[in-house]
Structures are given as structure tokens and as C-alpha cells.
């Protein structure tokens, strides 16, 4: 089986970036654009890393020359690159490896998960910073010189990722590598279709129920703002009111402030009425159930549902949720 290592460079700006959006939202957003991609394919004959920057159609032609069906494809934070490969270009590799996931299983949080930190730890080379200069630039905005520097940056990332993969590979068994492959593909090759009509009906039901509850509370605003009365209201819904030690009096008091984590945790309570009550007390306009349902509706409008799981999210080796 051949080994392919790749890295995509994409458009981002201050409002449209992976720090503002989920990976799914970012890639399926109308503003998404591939600036360029670097690919290195190693088989029986060594091949140097190739860079390409062009239109979506030309980039697809460039990518089609590689043997994806017969290769193990490696990337750092592979959910991002594999989702682009699959959703934008319709390419689904035979096997996938993610150096970020591999490093979590080996180092947990000791080293850090960034390519920069891992490359430094294994003394593989230095990661560049050219991506910082790409803020707000479309592909056509780059000068030839700027694009050449960006190409060097991307190629270097591919070289570092390949070296990192080879450094980590002996430390993991085949079973773990298969689990990483499966975890990445649950996101990059989703098959579950959400029913928008069902979700919309659920959202309307949740909102109607909240409105009815809020109408009752509006008739007696003192209940929602009075600590003792609000505590009793929570108890009627089977919730033990959270408490804390008052820094002023040194005595136990109700923890109903916006900064009280135990109280804010009730925003995610399984009972929608409890969510609504706590939202009203905190002045939050939407409950968690509303927000989640709206998020599912938006995903359904864009495509199938990716499953964002993080391999080896804790030191016990369990999976954890990713994105939102």
C-alpha cells in the first residue's frame, strides 16, 4: 500500500474561520475556498512533494492523478483535510491516518497536539508561520511571490507530517490505527440524513412549551427573581438547587448567579422545563434544546450528518465529542 501525505490551505478571515465555526460549518460554507494543496506520494518509487493552486476544477484534476484507492493517506488533524477531500472533491481514500490522533494516544497532553509542538518534540524541523499572512486573502489576491512562500509553507507541513507519522507509527498497533481510520471516516464520509420536517416540528413543540411556561412565570416575576421561590420551583421539577458558600457572610447560599457553573450546567438539563426556567433566570433567549435542534436543522440543509468524535480524548483512551 502506498503512503500519501497531504495538507490543504484554505481561505479564512476574522469572521470566517475554524475558531468561529465548526469544521462542518466552515467547509460547507459558501465562502469556503482551497488556496492550495500539497501532496506527497511514496510507493515503490520516491516522489517529491507536489504543490498545486488553482480553481476547484483544476485542483480536482491535480488530485485525481494520485492513487487514493490503494493508499494510506496521512494528515495532521485529518478530519479537516479528509472532509475537504471527500465533500469538496469526492475522493475517499482506502485508509486514513491522523498524526494528531496518534499523538494523543502516545503523549496525551504532555507535548501538545499542534504540528509545531510535536515537530519540535521529535526534532523533525521547524513549522513555518506563513499562514498568518494569508488572513483575508482569496487565491486570486496572492502575488506570485506570496503564493510561492505559501507553497513552501504547505510543503514543509507535509514533510513534517510524514516524518511525524513515521516517528509515531511504531508506537501504535494495527487495531488502534484501524480505530483512528474509522473515527475520521465517521466524520469525513457521513451517511446519516436528518429529517428536516421532524426536526422543525420538534423545534416548534419545544418553543411552544417554553412560551407556555414563560407565560405562567410572567404572571409572577417575583418567583423567578426570588432565590427561595426559585429554589422551590426547581424542586418541583426534581432538581436540587445548587448552593455555594457566600464570600460575604461565610454561610451557605443559593448558587444562582451567571458565574456559578453548577447553575449554568442546568441549561443542559434533560428536562426542557428546567432548561427554560434557568434560561429565564439567566436572561438567555434560547434553551440548549432549541439551539441544538436549530444546529441539526442547519446541518441537514447542508448535507448529511458528520459524527465528530475525538479519538483518545482522555487518558483512559475513551472517545470524546468534538466540534458542537
Model segments located where?
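A short acidic (Asp/Glu
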Residues: 15-17, 83-88, 233-234
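Aromatic-residue hotspot detector
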Residues: 62, 80, 84, 295, ...
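Conserved "right-hand" nucleotidyltransferase catalytic core of DNA-directed polymerases
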Residues: 1-9, 14, 29-31, 36-38, ...
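Active-site-proximal helix-loop-helix substrate-binding element of RNase H-like nuclease domains
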Residues: 32-61, 68-169, 176, 180
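Short, surface-exposed connector motifs at secondary-structure boundaries
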Residues: 66-69, 214-216
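Cytochrome P450 core scaffold surrounding the K-helix E-X-X-R motif
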Residues: 13-17, 51-53
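A short acidic-Thr-Gly-centered motif at the start of a beta-strand
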Residues: 1-2, 64-67
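Short, conserved, GDST-rich strand-edge loop motifs in beta-rich repeat architectures
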Residues: 20-25
Amino acid at each position: 500500500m502506498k503512503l500519501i501525505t497531504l495538507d490543504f490551505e484554505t481561505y479564512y478571515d476574522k469572521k470566517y474561520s475554524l475558531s468561529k465555526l465548526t469544521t462542518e460549518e466552515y467547509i460547507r460554507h459558501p465562502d469556503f475556498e482551497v488556496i492550495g494543496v500539497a501532496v506527497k506520494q511514496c510507493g515503490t518509487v520516491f516522489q517529491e512533494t507536489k504543490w498545486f493552486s488553482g480553481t476547484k476544477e483544476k485542483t480536482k484534476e491535480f488530485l485525481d492523478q494520485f492513487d487514493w484507492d490503494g493508499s494510506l493517506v496521512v494528515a495532521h488533524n485529518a478530519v479537516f483535510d479528509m472532509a475537504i477531500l471527500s465533500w469538496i472533491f469526492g475522493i475517499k481514500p482506502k485508509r486514513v491516518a491522523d498524526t494528531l490522533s496518534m499523538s494523543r494516544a502516545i503523549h496525551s497532553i504532555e507535548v501538545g497536539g499542534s504540528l509545531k509542538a510535536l515537530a519540535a518534540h521529535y526534532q523533525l524541523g521547524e513549522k513555518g508561520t506563513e499562514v498568518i499572512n494569508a488572513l483575508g486573502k482569496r487565491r486570486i489576491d496572492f502575488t506570485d511571490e506570496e503564493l510561492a512562500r505559501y507553497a513552501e509553507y504547505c510543503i514543509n507541513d507535509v514533510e513534517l507530517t510524514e516524518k511525524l507519522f513515521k516517528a509515531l507509527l511504531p508506537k501504535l498497533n494495527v487495531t488502534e490505527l484501524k480505530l483512528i481510520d474509522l473515527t475520521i471516516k465517521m466524520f469525513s464520509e457521513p451517511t446519516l440524513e436528518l429529517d428536516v420536517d421532524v426536526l422543525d416540528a420538534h423545534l416548534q413543540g419545544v418553543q411552544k412549551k417554553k412560551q407556555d411556561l414563560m407565560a405562567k412565570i410572567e404572571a409572577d416575576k417575583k418567583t423567578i427573581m426570588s432565590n427561595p421561590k426559585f429554589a422551590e420551583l426547581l424542586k418541583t421539577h426534581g432538581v436540587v438547587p445548587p448552593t455555594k458558600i457566600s464570600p460575604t457572610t461565610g454561610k451557605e447560599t443559593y448558587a444562582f448567579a451567571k458565574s456559578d457553573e453548577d447553575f449554568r450546567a442546568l441549561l443542559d438539563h434533560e428536562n426542557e422545563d428546567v432548561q427554560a426556567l434557568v434560561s429565564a433566570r439567566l436572561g438567555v433567549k434560547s434553551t440548549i434544546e432549541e439551539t441544538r435542534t436549530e444546529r441539526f436543522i442547519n446541518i441537514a440543509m447542508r448535507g448529511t450528518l458528520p459524527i465528530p468524535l475525538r479519538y483518545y480524548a482522555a487518558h483512559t483512551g475513551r472517545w470524546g465529542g468534538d466540534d458542537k
